[in-house]
Amino acid sequence: MERFKKASSIIETLKQQGHEAYFVGGSVRDLIIDRPIGDIDIATSALPEEVMAIFPRNVPVGLEHGTVIVLENGEPYEVTTFRTESEYEDFRRPSSVQFVRSLEEDLKRRDFTMNAIAMTEEGEMVDLFAGQEAIQQREIVTVGNAADRFQEDALRMMRGIRFVSALGFSLETKTKQAIETYGHLLEHIAIERITVEFEKLLTGTYCVKGLKELVETKLFSHLPYLQMSEERLLKATQYKWDSFETDIEAWAFFLYCIGEEHPSVFLRQWKFSNKKIKDIVAVLLAIRTRKEKDWDTVLLYKTGIYIAEMAERVYEAMIESYNPTSVKRVQSMFHALPIQGRQEMNVTGNDLLNWANKKPGPWVADMLQKIEEAIVKGNVVNEKERIREWLQGCNLL
């Protein structure tokens, strides 16, 4: 409750000004579940302009949605006006938002009952939709009619399964049936938004359970490049998923598990940046080599520590070893390398031109590459004169 106490002064101030205010959303849910608390959000009857007048230190980030960030005790808090939403457009966004003075109206528009619990600054729960009961039953239940909630915003179906992966809860029967019925509406949602939810699913503690729900609800058939992948996804659930340190590792492991032969094509369908695609593919290539042989100095140098660490963690997950010393061993090997990048070489192309008394050409790059590999292998010390002597001894000058 310590973090809530820090934010309680905002609620107290709003109440002193004649407004209602409560803690809401994921932070309240996680407090009940006893999970680490993320951002603390506050809902209030005060209109955005009233919030800004009461708290001069603010950032008006989403006034059309009633959200103002209030800076209090050195922390930013989202303060959002109670609101209700009209008919939704394209199964993803409300055509308009109306500010209201009723907490109940605000809570009833939310996705799942566990996310529709409010809490006073004293820690008293306002639970109008049996959210605590759902948490106790470890069930994910929509607020009100599941069909209505998913037709309002089809992304809620992905969010539901993402929560299965994060919390280990199960989808309540009617909620699950509604996903099976309305899964096709997911095709109205921007790929980028789906990718965010799927990535959270892959990094969840109960990822296997989430993947199984994805298959059982047939929601996978509306995801990029997975339309005909039921068997591949079931294959992925047979692996023991670890909690990876990065999303790059989670995607690499997922692609390995489903046996994806064209990872770059697959990832482009999910609208990833070129940098992220490059990193995931690099991890997969490093794993392929790692399966054939252990790390050596040249392989580690060429791979680089950033990719090598991730590849080693994924490789450990693949063989279900989870040896905590394996990544440390890779780190120690890398830090023991004579150089960790070409920029650390104590010789330049100009040095080679002077020593050889030859015109510039492709031979300079070839020679630098030979020297680089020799330094990494320990065949020559990374000192200019020693490198010159080595070149002469090898008849390369």
Swiss-Prot record:
Q: What class of enzyme is it?
A: transferase
Q: Which keywords describe this protein according to UniProt?
A: ATP-binding, Magnesium, Metal-binding, Nucleotide-binding, Nucleotidyltransferase, RNA repair, RNA-binding, Transferase, tRNA processing
Top-level division of the source organism's lineage = Bacteria
Q: Which residues bind CTP?
A: 26, 29, 110, 153, 156, 159, 162
Residues binding ATP: 26, 29, 110, 153, 156, 159, 162
Q: Which Pfam families match?
A: PolyA_pol, PolyA_pol_RNAbd, tRNA_NucTran2_2
Q: Does the keyword Phosphoprotein apply?
A: no
Under Gene Ontology molecular function, one entry of this record is:
magnesium ion binding
Assigned EC number = 2.7.7.72
- Which InterPro entries does this one have? Bact_CCA-adding_enz_type3_sf, CCA-adding_enz_C, CCA-adding_enz_firmicutes, NT_sf, PolA_pol_head_dom, PolyA_RNA-bd
Question: Any idea which positions bind Mg(2+)?
Answer: 39, 41
Q: Which reaction does it catalyse?
A: a tRNA precursor + 2 CTP + ATP = a tRNA with a 3' CCA end + 3 diphosphate; a tRNA with a 3' CCA end + 2 CTP + ATP = a tRNA with a 3' CCACCA end + 3 diphosphate
Per its Swiss-Prot or TrEMBL entry, what cofactor is needed? Mg(2+)
Query: Is rRNA-binding given among the entry's keywords?
Result: no
GO BP, one example? RNA repair
Miscellaneous comment in the UniProt entry for this protein: A single active site specifically recognizes both ATP and CTP and is responsible for their addition.
Please describe the quaternary structure of this protein. Homodimer.
Functionally, this protein is described as follows: Catalyzes the addition and repair of the essential 3'-terminal CCA sequence in tRNAs without using a nucleic acid template. Adds these three nucleotides in the order of C, C, and A to the tRNA nucleotide-73, using CTP and ATP as substrates and producing inorganic pyrophosphate. tRNA 3'-terminal CCA addition is required both for tRNA processing and repair. Also involved in tRNA surveillance by mediating tandem CCA addition to generate a CCACCA at the 3' terminus of unstable tRNAs. While stable tRNAs receive only 3'-terminal CCA, unstable tRNAs are marked with CCACCA and rapidly degraded.
Concerning NCBIfam families, the annotation shows:
PRK13299.1
Instruction: Tell me the protein family, please.
Output: Belongs to the tRNA nucleotidyltransferase/poly(A) polymerase family. Bacterial CCA-adding enzyme type 3 subfamily.
Protein's UniProt name: CCA-adding enzyme
Organism in which the protein naturally occurs: Bacillus cereus (strain G9842)
